[in-house]
Amino acid sequence: DELLKQSGAFRENQAVAERAMDSNDLERERGITIFAKPTSVEWNGTRINIVDTPGHADFGGEVERILSMVDGVVLLVDAAEGPMPQTKFVTSKALALGLRPIVVLNKVDKPDAEPDRALDECFDLFASLGASDEQLDFPTMYASGRSGWADMELDGPRKDLTALFDLIVEHVPAPAQQERKDEPFRMLATTLGHDPFIGRLLTGRVESGTLKAGATMKGLSRDGTQIESFRVTKIMAFRGLTQQPIDVAEAGDIVSIAGMAKVTVADSIVDPEVTEAMEAQPIDPPTITVTFGINDSPLAGRDGKHVQSRVIRNRLMKEAETNVAIRITDTPGGDAFEVAGRGELQMGVLIENMRREGFELSISRPQVLFRDIDGERNEPVEEVTIDVDDEYSGVVIEKLTGVRRGSLTEMKPAGAGKTRIIAHVPSRGLIGYQGEFMTDTRGTGVLNRVFHEWAPYKGKIPGRRAGVLISMESGQSVAFALWNLEERGKMFIGAQADIYQGMIIGEHSRENDLEVNPLKGKKLTNVRASGTDDAVRLTTPITLSLEEAIAYINDDELVEVTPSSVRLRKRYLDPHERKRMAKANQ
């Protein structure tokens, strides 16, 4: 935000939201970056192109594509926390491409900041990732983004970001592409966007040559086959937070091009005389899969406007076009689709986006994808970094290394009464752990995870222990009935909620599932009662968020997602059919 402000990208009276680059609603709500977004600023006659990338490995597909567009990286590290696991993920990708980093220690004005320790940890991180001597000789800056200053010295003048701009201009090499202006035009498409007036927009960095609006170009797929030839209708460049049309794009520029119908991400846009496609960065394979099905519950179609499988399929295909990290396959029945992706967070974001667009879906429990390596079954293992108060470290280690089949690799004091725990845990063991972790640490723990390696299958991991309370009737729940059911377990619904047969209304206090009737009213007689009736006071029901609900269910259960509600249900609503299927699966 401050780089944009201090470079004069905004008018003086322009109102700018905080975290201006996180333009998507979900990014603003969750405070994370999901999509990689380019911008550019002008500094003393030099144009600096900036690409903001996500840190979470779930959105790693965004990072891997974008790195081919830049010549250097600025790594922002919290001076109190030091480098986090997701820092490691993005940094490893950048170092592997030979990019030279600038390390900026942010938030040095926080009371618990330890910039020297954070700097040592950065150096150790780079060394462990196999950085070259040139990369290890990185310049460091101390900064406070909120106050809008950066200095080379910790006790510098603390005025503005001039020093950072100067360092970027001096340290990051100019694009090597600029020397290839006279060659034929070539560009690799890294992101796909959509503009309501112009249509599809492909963004990338011009590798060589120049491009004028109105020129005819062709699209090549990764293997070099021609997809289509098209006329470039518009060229847009990023200036501050807006895109502005330009007439000519030169080698080294980051631009968006309109006019093509079929060319997509990782394809090359080239001059008609070029025959070879450009090399695209390989993308890490998906690790989990979730089944998206039509909502076939009795309440289907009440909230959403998109309920047919055809519409859901088209929307998922459109998503796969712009998001290279997910893969979609049809299931034999035709009314469900398997979506493979990087992690629960990425799936949660996709479902949340679709739900806001008015879709109704039924979602299955996430399954981990296995891989055969040399005839042995392997599964994805993640590195988990946890910061917790000392008193909770025991229960966290016990949970991770016990039933969840993890192995503890490091444990050290993190200062201020906290412990840092690093463990390698199979992805299967982490499904649904976030909620349990928050309960165990009373909401004080911080958990970060990143893909580590494929490792031999670690054996069975038990699912949820408690059974569920299943409604045996359809209608609206009655407070009196719920009040009587409270001794049986915790409720997920309140009074006057719409329910149907086979819907899960609560968690049973024992291990078996129990069918209950939440519609049972009080029997009234014409005999006057001697005492007064007890007033019905219900305990507040547990409300599960979308991610919690998806992690909570077992394999024979589904989450029904509509624009206004998230409900849990059994896969087979009829109790006789449930018994039959349970027998068949034994």
Where are these regions (language model features)?
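Accessory interaction regions appended to the cores of large information-processing enzymes
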Residues: 137-139, 159, 163-171, 175, ...
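P-loop NTPase switch module centered on the Walker A-proximal segment
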Residues: 1-77, 121, 192-195
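Active-site glycine-centered loops adjacent to acidic/histidine catalytic or metal-binding residues
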Residues: 106, 144, 343
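Conserved Switch II/interswitch segment of TRAFAC-class P-loop GTPases
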Residues: 46-48, 53-60, 67-91, 95-117
